[in-house]
């Protein structure tokens, strides 16, 4: 017996080898010659099919039945691989999201209470009645094959004299037809079900994105980018998978099971009822296990949300993590969430194994219980009874095995539906910005308006205000700061404000110019602020800056706001830290909730804004300015000039204004980011502009230029609301609003001076500080001569007036200076640095982002080998395959034993009894169940281990990637690996691998038994296998490329989602929601298009394989007619019918496996990306325990390029910094200042030259040691989600007392101590903290780190003067023994440095003490001080 089986296996191997060789010869010679002869490629491959309609729409019924309409893609994929997107025709119009999304919009717009799943069924089921009819037809037709088989087996059992050969042949063809029609119908039902699933998926993704663009700020806080990505990927994929496979079957499976069991009872009698009872027991058990699977999966998805959110935060803050050397900390946080996720995924796998055991064993248990009962009742098991029952059970196999999976998928679907429903019911932002209307004729006037970040609190406040309407008490609050209550008990300068005869307006000489409306408005404002206005000069002298910085989290609401911005004039909003400036601007934009108390505002018809955190798209410089507007070259050039962008364009090289900008402007300086967003607003030509801190991030020269040429120039005649803490510009404003501790005080500049707000004193204090620093420098140098210093003081108005005309000129006399900060070199026009047309050469030079990697060709065994080795070993996998094969052999032997039982001669007393046969049969079933459990545990171990290893390796690879990797790859693309790809690896690969091994084992054993029964059937088998192999070759070349394109086509969806999420405020203020919505619809349609053709190609081969399988059934039946052993004949035909199902399922799941293994391929490609340069063990400099001990820094001929072929950012840069020196580094935006800091941290490696710290070349220092030894306060403070403690001391290196002491030094102790959980209080990405607070927290980190070298990278640009003074005071007190590098563009920030370094175009043009530079009238530094003097006095 064993020898015969070995011979059969050898024959099968020889057959496959022969087939493979013959097919290769045939395909690569005959077919390719034919291809060349008929020029197939000229027919299919030369044209661009991207915009051509779907060929299915114009195909005839025969092409639709055979899926011939998709052959063009198959042939092009085989003959001219790889495929690209232009080879793929359009999506059918019925599947486009423009036609499907409106079906679900009721859920958003009408506050539908209908559950999402029910709503989808009601909308999409009637559209796809063909799919419903096909599913019903397949269920009904599943009874036909067992009936035909029953008659065929009755024919086989007859003696030869009673047989009529033509009857047998007719029944053979009936088996062929019933098998083919049944399985072909399933293919068509899959196809139409798949179309439904695409409609649902596209519609859901569209409405989720549309809803996201409408989210209020509170809702946005509840849904971070990780949650949004999960909604758009994992949750919508659950819907797609369910509606593709189960949305009709969930109703039909129970009916099908009951009907087939009823048919089994009809065939076998009352014994079938016992089998029915066994089935009833297994179904609830499977359902319970399925529920547990879904429960654990849902829990794991919650941890996956957190993991992806943390990963997104890691990618967004990768620069800061590397500078702080905190990668390990963040990796541990992500790994912690990953472990929790894997814990529940592991529990899910245990339940999954139990489900597989129950469902796979149930058919055998039903058969055992049925035959046992049948035997005990005294009946004989005949061939007709036995194999008809087996066929019924084979038909029962899919509904029985699929029903539990279907139920637990439905439970998972409910969980996803609830997540989506909750999101869709989230509160939305009010429809329009606060100051929109159609007239635009009047001032912006707001009276008695309540603002709040929280809608619920706003309603409570409104109700409370209504209840207390008659009380003489008012509350005025703006976002943060204390709540000031105005009562009748206050007095103002000794005057009782209840005195109606007190003429406040006369006292402060306020003139309303006979404007009754303005008089009423100002009177109301003055009544509110009377009790709060003090002598501001006294306040400035006695101010406690610690109190100014104290805040409570979350920020309190804003109530009873009165605000005015005159039409066509400049309004400046100013105030201290957390005074409410940005909240007021957000309220005007409609970004926070509002309720009108008494009156509505007059409005303008268009409004644009710039925000403190600039939003830049990952597209070209030009597109970021145009922002969807058509190109107007004349205006475009004016905008470039007004925003001082021409020198930056020149520095971009050959790419000019088509140069790509990294996501979030990662490759740009902070000042350039702000100027680009200012240019965007200016180009759009609005009626009203709200500009939030745009002048703080640029140097004084550029700030003055922008103020004069942009704000007072091109924006002249527009309503401009400028939010700034730079009070030197206030005197130029037409209307001033001071926000002080939640109170709005407003009027003209002179009116506010009369009220006691002394701007001049604050400005003079700042100017005097510069003057005192200069005088101190003189004293330190014992230099008392009269020098030109007096010309630089802020009181010398004569020189100021003479120099006002020189603000925009080059600094003559300094031959080191390359060019002015604001103008182009002579001979270069602005037109020459703007690309005239989109020529391919310029575009290629302008590219920053790299095209997403896409492997080509068949990944073959290599990718599977890598995947398996990550979870176990190749030998372990081979052992698993053997167990799969063994279990199927045992099952097949049980069927063989059953035919022996049915065929034995019961009249012969020497033959074994029925009990003997029954016991052996039970032993076979027991062995099958045991090996079943073992095989599933083994494959689960491999896939689970691989998933764990892949994520860990991916995370380590990303964290070690150089900064250029993140500049060249959008966040969405990277998160796609951590989201969709890892999710597929975690969940779907287990099912796919298991099903492929199971079906493969079934096919091998089935083919083996058929050849064993009828050896001559091997001859036609060779032909059929050869034809099948040819189909497979054509299929594989195309489907692999389609799957890769499909994976890549998802990245733009996620990238755009991430981009829009981060830029919602800007997008909404520009009214660009529709444009981005259309972009997302295009991206979704492209992804669905590739998905559509991918599935169509699978159906093309599926229908052909089904036909070949039906021929196998026909041949097996024909050979059985002439077989002398009826039992073996019955076994052969039954096995052939099983091949039909198994081959169909194998093709389906193998295609699914190939698709999912692409996720492994994509993750693997990121694991192998280049890493940051590691120091070799031999080259590593073994530093002492304390390093650096002195803090000496030396740059030696350093040259740095961000990319190999780019312009050098630093050139021939040499500079030596002694220990404990304070170095001030200044230069225009983009001059290379920040690159110096980046090079110190080895964020960018030197192209040439070297950097030494304490005499050690930092390129030979371990990266972690280097970065952890240098302190930094960055220009864009980044606060990670987590506690205050985590943001200050992530490695628990310091005690609570040390942390509190550091907080006290930066004057944040009071703020943190008032938080509910003190150091453990959560700050989600810095929400509720001002820029100043964030900078102080970063300063606190530097104090705790106690490094010998500290870098301050433009750390005070975006904060007010008081906070800047606090930071400088803290630096002086806590970093006395440190080497300090201060990068800045404000002179007063670095004037007290020991030396000043001036950088221009990447070169060091001046480096000396401040005094020496000041004494040199030709130096750049002395001219900068003069310029600073001129600008401020001109404004005054």
Swiss-Prot record:
InterPro entries: AAA+_ATPase, ABC1_TM_dom, ABC1_TM_sf, ABC_transporter-like_ATP-bd, ABC_transporter_C-like, ABCC_6TM_D1, ABCC_6TM_D2, P-loop_NTPase. The chain crosses the membrane at residues 8-28, 129-149, 165-185, 238-258, 261-281, 349-369, 373-393, 873-893, 919-939, 985-1005, 1017-1039, 1101-1121, 1127-1147. Its main location: membrane. Residues 543-766, 1193-1426 form the ABC transporter domain. Residues 128-412, 865-1155 form the ABC transmembrane type-1 domain. SUPFAM superfamilies: ABC transporter transmembrane region, P-loop containing nucleoside triphosphate hydrolases. One of its GO terms (biological process) is sorocarp development. It is a multi-pass membrane protein. Keywords: ATP-binding, Membrane, Nucleotide-binding, Repeat, Transmembrane, Transmembrane helix, Transport. It is found in: Membrane. ATP binds at residues 575-582, 1227-1234. It comes from the Eukaryota. GO terms for molecular function: ABC-type transporter activity; ATP binding; ATP hydrolysis activity; ATPase-coupled transmembrane transporter activity. One of its GO terms (cellular component) is membrane. Belongs to the ABC transporter superfamily. ABCC family. Conjugate transporter (TC 3.A.1.208) subfamily. This is ABC transporter C family member 15.
């Amino acid at each position: 017996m064993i020898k015969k089986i070995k011979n059969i296996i050898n024959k099968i191997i020889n057959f496959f080898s022969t087939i493979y060789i013959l097919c290769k010869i045939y395909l690569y010679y005959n077919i390719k010659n034919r291809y060349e002869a008929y020029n197939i490629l000229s027919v299919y491959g030369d044209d661009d099919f991207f915009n051509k309609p779907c060929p299915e729409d114009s195909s005839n019924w025969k092409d639709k039945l055979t899926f011939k309409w998709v052959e063009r893609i198959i042939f092009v994929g085989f003959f001219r691989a790889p495929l690209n997107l232009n080879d793929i025709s359009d999506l059918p119009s019925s599947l486009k999201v423009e036609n499907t999304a409106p079906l679900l919009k009721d859920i958003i717009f009408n506050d539908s209470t209908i559950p999402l799943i029910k709503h989808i069924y009601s909308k999409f089921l009637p559209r796809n009645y063909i799919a419903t009819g096909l599913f019903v037809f397949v269920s009904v037709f599943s009874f036909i094959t067992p009936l035909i088989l029953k008659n065929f087996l009755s024919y086989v059992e007859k003696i030869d004299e009673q047989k009529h050969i033509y009857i047998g042949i007719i029944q053979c063809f009936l088996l062929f037809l019933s098998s083919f029609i049944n399985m072909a119908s399933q293919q068509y039902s899959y196809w139409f079900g798949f179309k439904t699933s695409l409609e649902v998926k596209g519609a859901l993704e569209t409405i989720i994105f549309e809803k996201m663009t409408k989210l209020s700020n509170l809702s946005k806080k509840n849904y971070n980018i990780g949650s949004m990505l999960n909604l758009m990927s994992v949750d919508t994929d659950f819907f797609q998978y369910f509606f593709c496979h189960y949305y009709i079957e969930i109703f039909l499976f129970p009916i099908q099971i009951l009907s087939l069991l009823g048919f089994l009872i009809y065939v076998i009698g009352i014994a079938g009822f016992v089998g029915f009872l066994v089935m009833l027991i297994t179904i609830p058990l499977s359902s319970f296990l399925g529920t547990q699977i879904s429960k654990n999966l849902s829990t794991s998805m919650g941890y996956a949300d957190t993991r992806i959110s943390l990963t997104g935060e890691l990618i967004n803050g990768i620069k800061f993590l590397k500078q702080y050397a905190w990668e390990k900390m963040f990796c541990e946080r992500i790994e912690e969430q990953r472990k929790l996720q894997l814990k529940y995924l592991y529990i899910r796998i245990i339940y999954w194994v139990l489900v597989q055991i129950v469902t796979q064993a149930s058919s055998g248990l039903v058969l055992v219980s049925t035959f046992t009962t049948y035997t005990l009742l005294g009946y004989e098991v005949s061939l007709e009874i036995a194999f008809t029952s087996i066929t019924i059970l084979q038909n029962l196999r899919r509904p029985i095995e699929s029903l539990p999976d279907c139920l637990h998928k439905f439970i998972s679907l409910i969980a996803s539906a609830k997540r989506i429903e909750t999101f869709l019911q989230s509160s939305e932002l009010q429809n329009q910005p606060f100051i929109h209307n159609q007239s635009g004729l009047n001032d912006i006037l707001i009276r008695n308006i309540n603002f709040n970040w929280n809608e619920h609190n706003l309603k409570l406040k409104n109700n409370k205000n209504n209840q207390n309407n008659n009380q003489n008490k008012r509350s005025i609050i703006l976002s943060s700061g204390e709540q000031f209550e105005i009562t009748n008990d206050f007095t103002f300068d000794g005057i009782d404000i209840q005195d109606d005869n007190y003429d406040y307006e006369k006292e402060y000489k306020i003139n309303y110019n006979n404007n009754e409306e303005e008089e009423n408005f100002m009177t109301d404002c003055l009544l509110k602020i009377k009790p709060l206005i003090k002598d501001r000069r006294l306040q400035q002298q006695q101010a406690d800056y610690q109190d100014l910085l104290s805040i409570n989290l979350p920020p309190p609401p804003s109530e009873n706001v009165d605000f005015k911005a005159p039409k066509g004039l400049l309004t400046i909003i100013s105030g201290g830290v957390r005074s409410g400036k940005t909240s007021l601007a957000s309220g005007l934009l409609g970004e926070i909730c509002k309720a009108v108390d008494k009156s509505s505002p007059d409005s303008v018809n268009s409004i644009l804004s710039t925000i403190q955190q600039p939003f830049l798209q990952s597209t070209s410089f030009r597109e970021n300015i145009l922002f969807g507007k058509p190109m107007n070259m004349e205006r475009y050039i004016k905008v470039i000039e007004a925003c001082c962008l021409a020198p930056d364009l020149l520095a971009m090289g050959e790419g000019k204004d088509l140069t790509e900008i990294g996501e979030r402007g990662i490759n740009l300086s902070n000042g350039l980011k702000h100027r680009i967003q200012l240019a965007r607003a200016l180009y759009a030509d609005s009626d009203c502009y709200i500009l939030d801190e745009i002048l703080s991030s640029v140097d004084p020269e550029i700030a003055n230029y922008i103020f004069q040429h942009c704000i007072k120039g091109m924006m002249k005649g527009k309503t401009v609301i400028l939010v700034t803490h730079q009070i030197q510009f206030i005197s130029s404003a037409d209307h001033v609003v001071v926000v002080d501790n939640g109170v709005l005080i407003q009027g003209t500049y002179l009116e506010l001076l009369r009220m006691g707000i002394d701007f001049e004193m604050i400005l003079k204090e700042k100017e005097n500080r510069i003057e005192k620093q200069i005088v101190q420098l003189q004293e330190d140098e014992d230099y008392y001569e009269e020098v030109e210093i007096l010309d630089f003081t802020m009181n010398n108005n004569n020189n100021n007036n003479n120099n006002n005309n020189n603000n925009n000129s080059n600094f003559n006399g300094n031959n080191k200076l390359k060019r002015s900060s604001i103008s182009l070199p002579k001979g270069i026009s602005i037109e020459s640095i703007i690309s005239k047309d989109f020529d391919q050469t310029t575009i290629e030079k302008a590219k920053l982002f790299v095209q997403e990697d896409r492997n080509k060709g068949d990944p073959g065994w290599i990718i599977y080998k890598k995947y398996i080795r990550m979870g176990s070993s190749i030998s372990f996998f081979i052992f698993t395959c053997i167990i799969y094969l063994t279990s199927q052999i045992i099952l097949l032997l049980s069927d063989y034993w059953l035919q022996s039982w049915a065929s034995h001669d019961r009249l012969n007393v020497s033959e074994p009894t029925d009990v003997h046969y029954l016991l052996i049969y039970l032993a076979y079933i027991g062995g099958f169940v045991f090996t079943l459990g073992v095989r599933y545990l083994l494959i689960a171990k491999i896939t689970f281990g691989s998933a764990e290893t892949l994520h860990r390796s991916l995370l380590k690879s990303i964290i070690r990637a150089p900064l250029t990797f993140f500049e060249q790859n959008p966040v969405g693309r990277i998160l796609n690996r951590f989201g969709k790809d890892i999710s597929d690896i975690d969940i779907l690969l287990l099912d796919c691998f298991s099903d492929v091994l199971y079906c493969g084992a079934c096919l091998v054993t089935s083919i083996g038994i058929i050849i064993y029964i009828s050896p001559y059937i091997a001859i036609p088998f060779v032909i059929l296998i050869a034809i099948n192999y040819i189909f497979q070759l054509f299929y594989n070349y195309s489907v692999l490329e389609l799957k890769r394109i499909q994976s890549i086509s998802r990245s733009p969806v996620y990238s755009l989602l991430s981009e829009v999420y981060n830029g919602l405020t800007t997008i909404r203020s520009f009214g660009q929601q529709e444009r981005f919505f259309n972009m997302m619809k295009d991206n979704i349609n492209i992804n669905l298009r590739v998905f559509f053709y991918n599935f169509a190609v699978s159906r093309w081969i599926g229908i052909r394989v089904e036909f070949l399988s039906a021929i196998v059934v026909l041949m097996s039946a024909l050979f059985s007619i002439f077989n002398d052993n009826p039992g073996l004949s019955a076994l052969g035909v039954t096995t052939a019918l099983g091949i039909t199902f198994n081959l169909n399922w194998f093709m389906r799941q193998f295609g699914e496996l190939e698709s999912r293994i692409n996720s492994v391929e994509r993750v693997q490609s990121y694991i192998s990306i280049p890493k940051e340069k590691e120091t070799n063990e031999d080259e590593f400099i073994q530093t002492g325990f304390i390093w650096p001990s002195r803090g000496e820094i030396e740059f030696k001929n350093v040259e740095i390029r961000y990319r190999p072929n780019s312009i050098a950012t630093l050139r021939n840069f040499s500079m030596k910094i002694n220990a404990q020196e304070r170095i001030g580094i200044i230069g225009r935006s983009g001059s290379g200042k920040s690159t110096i800091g980046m090079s110190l941290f080895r964020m960018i490696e030197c192209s040439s030259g070297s950097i030494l710290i304490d005499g050690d070349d930092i390129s030979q220092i371990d990266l972690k040691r280097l970065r952890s030894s240098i302190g930094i306060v960055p220009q864009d403070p980044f606060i990670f989600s987590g506690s205050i403690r985590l943001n200050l001391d992530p490695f628990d290196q310091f005690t609570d007392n040390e942390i509190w002491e550091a907080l006290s030094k930066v004057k944040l102790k009071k703020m943190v101590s008032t938080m509910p959980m003190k150091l453990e209080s959560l700050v989600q990405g810095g929400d509720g903290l001002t820029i100043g607070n964030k900078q102080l927290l970063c300063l606190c980190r530097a104090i705790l780190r106690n490094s010998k070298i500290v870098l301050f990278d433009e750390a005070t640009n975006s904060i007010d003067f008081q906070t800047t003074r606090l930071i400088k005071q803290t630096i002086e007190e806590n970093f006395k023994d440190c080497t300090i590098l201060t990068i800045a563009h404000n002179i007063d920030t670095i004037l007290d440095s020991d030396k000043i370094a001036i950088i221009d175009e990447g070169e060091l043009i001046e480096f000396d003490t401040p005094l020496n530079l000041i004494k040199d009238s030709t130096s750049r530094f002395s001219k900068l001080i003069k310029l600073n003097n001129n600008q401020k006095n001109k404004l005054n």
